[in-house]
Design a protein with these regions (language model features):
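Positively charged, low-complexity/disordered segments
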Residues: 2-6
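Alpha-helical transmembrane segments in inner-membrane proteins
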Residues: 7-287
Length: 287
């Protein structure tokens, strides 16, 4: 029994570490791409779309036989992809250059729209409100090796793409026009980074629900140590994100033992405090 519990905890820890790594790398990449310190992997609205897919699966009992949470994961990833197509399509129609302001605006509007649809779905499944609420708060309890492999595969593929764009992300720091002048294909890099981030976020949301502030706070903390160079920032953010989420998950399990908190509640509570502290220190440094 002890071996079984230990094995389950080991699987959970791996899921937590991989999720924290993925969310933090996505946050660092989006902050560099959009030159916006408030950006993270959810800025595009894809995480909202993934949440909608998962909630629909839970509310209406969409499952795949033999694999736990497979229906929820499949629907979340499908809706993440559809959300990206919708957001980029609207942004391209409004602004063919896919400017940062347009992308952020479309992402915010889309997230608000999805939020209203989520509320509508919940009204049609009142008996599933508790399950939906717990899932949307974020939790990695009860995950298996299938989820570890899904997270690992997504991180290797899409995380590798983001690491490969480190030089181009450094160029974005001096502005899109200047990046274009030194030979960076701005539109291609934007699309590449946004697709990779969206895919990785979609997988994370499909496995663990909505876990906020990891991709927002961790890159800020790491940047204080490594500086803005993405060749150092991205790997350091990956390491920092894993540690941050593992600490938050430990608190979620033990703070009110035997009752377990959703890890997303802990990350939001700690992350919001850390973000305020970092923001104040940064503002003081600028003065």
């Amino acid at each position: 029994c002890a071996c079984l519990v230990g094995s389950e905890m080991c699987i959970r820890d791996r899921c937590v570490a991989l999720t924290g790594t993925s969310l933090s790398v996505c946050g660092a990449a989006m902050q560099g791409l959009l030159k916006n310190p408030l950006a993270d992997g959810s800025t595009l609205g894809v995480s909202s779309g993934a949440s909608l897919g998962a909630v629909i699966s839970i509310a209406f009992g969409i499952t795949l036989p033999g694999i736990p949470l497979a229906g929820t994961m499949s629907m979340a990833m499908l809706f993440a992809f559809l959300s990206l197509v919708v957001i980029l399509g609207l942004a391209y129609r409004l602004d063919g250059s896919l400017s940062t302001g347009t992308i952020i605006l479309i992402g915010v509007i889309y997230s608000m729209f999805v939020s209203s649809v989520l509320s509508l779905v919940i009204t049609f499944a009142p008996d599933k409100v508790q399950s939906i609420t717990f899932w949307t708060m974020g939790s990695l309890a009860g995950r298996g090796y299938v989820h570890v492999l899904v997270l690992l595969g997504a991180l290797v593929v899409f995380g590798g793409v983001l690491f490969g764009c480190a030089r181009e992300l450094n160029a974005f720091a001096v502005g899109e026009d200047n990046a274009r002048h030194i030979g960076v294909n701005v539109r291609r890099v934007k699309l590449t980074v946004m697709i990779a981030v969206s895919a990785l976020i979609g997988v994370c949301v499909s496995v663990g629900g909505t876990i906020g502030f990891v991709g927002l706070v961790t890159p800020h903390m790491v940047r204080l140590i490594t500086g803005p160079n993405h060749r150092r920032l991205l790997p350091a953010s990956a390491f920092g994100g894993a540690i941050f989420l593992m600490l938050c998950d430990l608190l979620a399990r033990t703070l009110f033992d035997p009752r377990e908190l959703p890890v997303g509640v802990v990350t939001s509570f700690i992350g919001s405090i850390l973000f305020v502290v970092i923001f104040i220190r940064t503002r003081r440094g600028e003065k």
